[in-house]
A protein has these predicted regions:
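Signature of Gram-negative outer-membrane beta-barrel scaffolds
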Residues: 387-510
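Extracytoplasmic beta-strand/coil segments of soluble accessory domains associated
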Residues: 57, 78-119, 135, 141
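Conserved C-terminal beta-signal and adjacent last beta-strands/turns
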Residues: 247-249, 506, 517, 549-551, ...
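Surface-exposed extracellular loop regions of Gram-negative outer-membrane beta-barrel proteins
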Residues: 258, 475-482, 493, 506-552, ...
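Short acidic/polar hinge/loop motifs at secondary-structure boundaries
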Residues: 100, 119-147, 166-168, 271
């Protein structure tokens, strides 16, 4: 009843209101679904546009540079997108840089991410590690969120949607920008951007550098990150352009890696982090992450009167890891009276062992990859409103990971129990290890992935139709020097073929009204961590392509001072595969099992409305209501890793359980007021409800337990930002913007993320609570 009332209030309050600058109102041409020219680089460097918000058969939302700057202080990159219906982004654990994103109830592995038209989601699990892209917010020109199928045929992960990111390149004139953002709890960001404008012989250069440092909101979560971006553009004649981009963000940040109980939050507060303590009088965090992922692209864009082509090559080499711990029995449990790790107690215990063997140690868990690829896409405009397109994409992805002892914590040596941790057994290896020695893991994967597509589109004054199909194939091999020491370290080849079909149509009724419909079908290959889910070179049994069928229909109404959009969607996700945690089988060691054939159904309604009430006031509101559930119970067979013999069957009972990890009801509103003398005020309100704790379906093995995972209490968030802006009226002027913002002004206590417990209630739940009331500030100068 409360949700229905709030939804009604949101719609009524905004019934006479609608869009602002981040919802373009002009009916610009729409690119065909197959053509992935998502760049809109200052309209002159690259004529490759985002899909038009007003003329596309997709549910879109575009955030421009000014909007992103307005939201950017002390937030992770995905959090810039909050306020879009059915999208939920948080900092995950509260650590700076760690973030998590859901769209329409689907997690990151079902959300495609492209950067300047190039897919950047990982091929191992489909996830995005946003801390590897910390500086991206300062280099972004615009972001477009495409719900559902998306416009790209070069990514096969767009089930929830696609995030298209476009970085800045030089404009025609010289420009420079510098600024400093910060939070009152200690995080500070400084940045500098310089654009050369047009230089002789068709050259232009853009440079960005930024730094983030200081304390996070959560205790002992310092951050130290530098970011850079270089763009060099060369115009060749009237139709050709070359764009070279280099960007990266070497970073180090402390983390909160352990979820909290409600009892701990009540006792120690929202900032509590149980992963640190004092060591030699200094704060010392058990979890410290560092990573550097330099990224390079070279793009050639040829745009003629009828024929257009875009060619891209890219390469990135990632390297980094994090502080880890290994223990002989239980994790580090020594606690001081204030709930922190008692490092002195841990060290004393290691020193008291008779033979000097360490019971607990620290290690560096390292991971890296080499990732390169090439894309070629083309489009030809025919007579009669027809357009045809085609493209190919090749990706090579090689990963590695290992673990190295970094600190014996007062001990003299560590015993590596090869007999129980390695499939090869001892294999003549020395089990006595010390600082600098490798333990526990030394493996990686090599994946080759290729995609090809064909598309077509037809457009008249009132009708737009787009359709196309793609085929993709991949092969993966895994190597493991730890489990197969002294033998063949390579696995057999795993892989397969998949495909997709997409189509969309829009009809302009007249007077700003239009109706649209789109749909798609995917047969998506398993990610490499599904093929090799058991931690060794054995290929997972009975794994099939995931099938995704989705569709949406909507009504869009655009008028001079506003816009309204209403969309209904449905997505069927079939044959999901999940690997269980360790499971005890009678007369056998703990084993894992692969659950296949899980199905889920996501459907819902989204509403958004915006209105410029007067020249000085704008009001917008949105609402989304979803119904996301697991559909079926499934069975799994447990196999012995050594013999391959079946050990037994196990059943998983998920039918009818709500999907967790994102709110199924969202309502929000924004009020923007222009005050005389350059001042501006933004007020924003968000309401989240019907959010269930995340859970692993494979843990639901009790046929009598059909209780949904823990349902979080609903909550309201109120924010505000006061700004003063002095715009440039002449090229010689200096523009200035100063702002002061506040988040969670009501100081609401709410849960952002977490895992369900055995009792499916607050007592057994473990998770992360949101930030309390906090404030941010910023100063930005433009030249």
């Amino acid at each position: 009843m409360t949700t229905t009332l709030l939804l009604g209030i949101a719609i009524l309050c905004s019934a006479s209101v609608v869009p602002d600058s981040d919802m373009p109102l002009k009916n610009s041409p729409t690119e065909p679904l197959g053509y992935i020219d998502t760049l809109s680089i200052q309209e002159s460097i690259v004529r490759s546009n985002f899909s038009s918000d007003a003329g596309s058969p997709l549910r879109l939302k575009t955030l421009d540079k000014e909007t992103l700057s307005f939201r950017g202080a002390s937030r992770t990159y995905p959090e810039l997108l909050n306020g879009i219906p059915s999208l939920y982004a948080t900092s995950e654990s509260g650590s700076y840089g760690d973030a998590k994103l859901n769209i329409r109830g689907f997690g990151q592995s079902n959300i495609a991410v492209t950067l300047n038209g190039i897919p950047i989601s990982g091929l191992v699990s489909g996830n995005m590690y946003w801390n590897n892209w910390m500086g991206l917010a300062d280099a972004t020109y615009a972001i477009q969120v495409q719900k559902g199928v998306g416009s790209s045929f070069l990514t096969d992960g767009s089930v929830g949607g696609t995030i298209n990111i476009v970085t800045e390149v030089p404009d025609e004139k010289f420009e420079a920008e510098a600024g400093i953002y910060g939070s009152f709890y200690g995080t500070v960001k400084a940045f500098l951007k310089i654009g050369s404008g047009n230089l002789p012989k068709g050259w232009s250069v853009n440079l960005m550098a930024s730094y983030v440092g200081g304390d996070g909101y959560v205790d002992a979560t310092k951050v130290n990150s530098f970011a850079y971006m270089l763009n060099v553009c060369k115009t060749l004649g009237t139709d050709h352009k070359l764009i070279f981009t280099a960007l990266g963000s070497p970073e180090q940040h402390e983390q909160r890696g352990t979820r909290l109980s409600w009892e701990e939050v009540q006792k120690y507060g929202l900032r509590y982090n149980r992963n640190w303590g004092l060591r030699d009088g200094q704060a010392f965090n058990l979890n410290l992450n560092n990573y550097f992922k330099p990224y390079f692209t070279l793009q050639h864009i040829w745009r003629g009167e009828r024929f257009s082509m875009k060619n891209s090559v890219y390469v990135t080499v990632g390297n980094g890891g994090g502080r880890w711990s290994e223990n002989k029995s239980t994790p580090i449990l020594y606690r001081s009276k204030d709930g922190l790790i008692d490092w002195d107690g841990v060290i004393a215990t290691n020193r008291e062992t008779e033979d000097g063997q360490a019971l607990s140690i620290l290690s560096d868990y390292m991971a890296g990859h080499t990732y390169f690829g090439a894309i070629s896409s083309m489009e030809y405009r025919l007579d009669g409103g027809w357009t045809i397109g085609a493209g190919i994409h090749y990706q090579y992805y090689s990963t590695w990971e290992n673990e190295k002892i970094s600190d014996l914590l007062g001990g003299e040596w560590w015993y590596e129990d090869y007999e129980h941790t390695s499939l090869a057994g001892l294999a003549s290896r020395n089990p006595v290890k010390t600082v600098g020695d490798y333990i526990r893991t030394d493996n990686g994967k090599v994946t080759n992935h290729g995609t090809a597509y064909l598309s077509a589109g037809w457009r008249s004054e009132k009708v737009t139709v787009n359709f196309g199909a793609s085929v993709f194939g991949a092969s993966t091999r895994r190597w493991d020097k730890y489990n197969y020491y002294g033998g063949d370290v390579w696995s057999p080849l795993a892989g397969g073929v998949g495909g997709s079909i997409k189509a969309g149509a829009l009809y302009k009724i007249g007077r700003g009204h239009s109706l649209y419909v789109n749909g798609g079908w995917y047969s998506r290959l398993p990610y490499s961590n599904v093929w090799f889910a058991s931690g060794n070179n054995e290929i997972s049994r009975d794994v099939k392509n995931e099938m995704n069928a989705m569709g949406e229909a909507g009504w869009r109404w655009v008028w001079n001072s506003g816009a309204l959009e209403l969309t209904g969607y449905a997505s069927l996700w079939k044959d999901k595969s999940l690997m269980s945690n360790a499971y005890k089988v009678e007369n056998s060691l703990d084993v894992k099992y692969m659950v296949t054939g899980l199905d889920a159904f996501h459907c819902g309604v989204e509403f958004e409305i915006r209105q410029r009430i007067a020249d000085w006031i704008r009001l917008s509101a949105f609402a989304s209501v979803g119904n996301w559930k697991w559909m079926n119970d499934v069975s799994a067979t447990i196999y012995d890793h050594y013999s391959g013999n079946a050990l037994g069957d196990i059943n998983v009972y998920c039918a009818g359980l709500p999907v967790g990890d994102a709110p199924q009801t969202q309502i929000g509103a924004d009020l923007d007021i222009d005050i005389p003398a350059g001042f501006g005020l933004n007020l924003n309100w968000r309401f989240n409800n019907r959010m269930y704790a995340d859970f692993d379906p494979v843990t639901r093995t009790n046929p009598d337990d059909r209780t949904p995972s823990y349902r979080f209490p609903s909550y309201h968030l109120l924010g505000a930002q006061l700004s003063w802006t002095r715009r440039k009226s002449h090229p010689e002027d200096v523009g200035c913007r100063i702002f002061l913002g506040g988040n969670n002004l009501l100081d609401s206590v709410y849960i952002e993320r977490g895992k369900d417990g055995a009792s499916h209630n607050l007592e057994s739940f473990r998770g992360y609570w949101g930030f309390g009331r906090n404030f941010s500030f910023g100063l930005c100068l433009s030249f």
